[in-house]
């Protein structure tokens, strides 16, 4: 179903039952344009989203990771469902594909085509689009939860929408990218620029996958050979690259990683946050080391820090959550 809203503050409520087989779609910013941080104005922004539970004025907003989408039921089953932290019987759960994404929302490629070149997007731009969606759904208060890029986007929500965000959960994400993280993204974008059309994106994914795991994790899961003469880790990385290139857009990859790299809130910005926040670090995370995540949490006046102990690196929040769902559920209910 697609609904067209005249303006970003419309109170139109989409009342169809949530369809877990595909997202709902709404068009926002028809009457008043969305003003981007780069100075451009966008009209007719399409947003793809999923909802779970009965619509109401307070909700939990899930923010997806870099290559994710709005189908939380597909990629976060440890968190969504009966008796889990995001229980549709007790909560109204919303997740939208971000601005610039390639899973139903107006994409980076579409923006480039209509604006005669790439359009720089910011995480704050994405938060403003998300807020417009919540306005259209009649949501007035929200609990925000995100991991990886979604965690960085949660920081943007805390800064951009302080009147709307009741509390936030930030998993495996810093408030700002370090030179290490920017360097990894720079290498990925360089690969895409040198080999557009999919081959560069495959290499970008291989670079990213190494930062998402840990040496011990790969030693346990990708040792030896599955094909004679080919190391298992080589087969694994090739498979991951092929899989992403088949479903993801390289312009989206560049736009979203650039937005993450450019998001650099000051310590004063973070100290102004008044909402309670649960920040989760991952003990073996190479991309966002736990010490870095913990240091960002210390800049928030009302943050609790908890660390997930796992050998599986950054992706442990998906691969090896252990007690994480229980910790998150307790915080959201408190």
UniProtKB/Swiss-Prot annotation:
Q: Which InterPro entries match?
A: AB_hydrolase_1, AB_hydrolase_fold, HAT_MetX-like
- Which GO molecular function terms does the record list? homoserine O-acetyltransferase activity
Kindly state a single biological-process term from the GO annotations of this entry.
methionine biosynthetic process
Pathway listed: Amino-acid biosynthesis; L-methionine biosynthesis via de novo pathway; O-acetyl-L-homoserine from L-homoserine: step 1/1
Q: Principal place where this protein is found?
A: cytoplasm
The signal peptide here is none
Q: Which reaction does it catalyse?
A: L-homoserine + acetyl-CoA = O-acetyl-L-homoserine + CoA
Q: What class of enzyme is it?
A: transferase
Superkingdom, taxonomy of origin = Bacteria
Positions of disulphide bridges = none
Which residues are substrate-binding?
A: 205, 315
Q: Does the keyword Acyltransferase apply?
A: yes
Its EC number is 2.3.1.31
Q: Where in the cell is the protein located?
A: Cytoplasm
Q: Which GO terms describe its cellular component?
A: cytoplasm
* AB hydrolase-1 domain segment(s): 61-318
Q: Which residues form the active site?
A: 148 (nucleophile), 285, 314
Keywords associated with the record: Acyltransferase, Amino-acid biosynthesis, Cytoplasm, Methionine biosynthesis, Transferase
- What role does this protein play? Transfers an acetyl group from acetyl-CoA to L-homoserine, forming acetyl-L-homoserine.
Q: Which HAMAP family match?
A: MetX_acyltransf
Q: Which family does it belong to?
A: Belongs to the AB hydrolase superfamily. MetX family.
How does the record describe its quaternary structure? Answer: Homodimer.
Kindly provide the name given to this protein in its UniProt entry: Homoserine O-acetyltransferase
Q: What species does this protein belong to? A: Deinococcus radiodurans (strain ATCC 13939 / DSM 20539 / JCM 16871 / CCUG 27074 / LMG 4051 / NBRC 15346 / NCIMB 9279 / VKM B-1422 / R1)
Which gene underlies this protein? metXA
């Amino acid at each position: 179903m697609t609904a067209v809203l005249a303006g970003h503050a419309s109170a139109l409520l989409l009342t169809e039952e949530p369809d877990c087989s595909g997202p709902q779609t709404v068009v926002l910013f028809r009457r008043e344009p969305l003003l981007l941080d780069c100075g451009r104005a966008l009209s007719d922004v399409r947003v793809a989203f999923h909802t779970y539970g009965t619509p109401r004025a307070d909700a939990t907003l899930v923010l997806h990771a870099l290559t994710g989408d709005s189908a939380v039921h597909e990629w976060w089953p440890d968190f969504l469902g009966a008796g889990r932290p995001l229980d549709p019987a007790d909560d109204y759960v919303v997740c939208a594909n971000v601005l610039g994404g390639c899973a139903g929302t107006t994409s980076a490629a579409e923006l480039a085509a209509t604006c005669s070149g790439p359009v720089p997007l910011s995480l704050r731009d994405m938060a403003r689009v998300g807020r417009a969606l919540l306005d259209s759904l009649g949501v007035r208060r929200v609990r925000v939860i995100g991991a990886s890029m979604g965690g960085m986007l949660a920081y943007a929500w805390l800064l951009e929408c302080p009147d709307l965000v009741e509390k936030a959960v930030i998993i495996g994400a810093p408030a700002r990218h370090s030179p290490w993280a920017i360097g990894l993204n720079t290498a990925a974008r360089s690969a895409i620029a040198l080999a557009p059309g999919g081959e560069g994106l495959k290499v970008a994914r291989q670079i990213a996958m190494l930062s998402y795991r840990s040496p011990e994790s790969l030693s346990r899961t990708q040792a030896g050979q599955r094909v004679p003469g080919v190391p298992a880790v080589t087969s694994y990385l090739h498979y991951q690259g092929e899989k992403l290139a088949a479903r993801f857009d390289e312009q989206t990859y560049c736009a979203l990683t650039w937005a993450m790299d450019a998001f650099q809130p000051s310590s004063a910005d973070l100290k102004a946050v008044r909402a309670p926040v649960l920040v989760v670090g991952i003990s073996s995370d190479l991309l966002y080391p736990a010490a870095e995540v913990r240091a960002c949490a210390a800049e928030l006046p009302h943050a609790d820090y908890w660390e997930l102990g796992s050998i599986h690196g950054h992706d442990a929040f998906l691969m090896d959550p252990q007690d994480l769902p229980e910790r998150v559920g307790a915080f959201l209910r408190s």
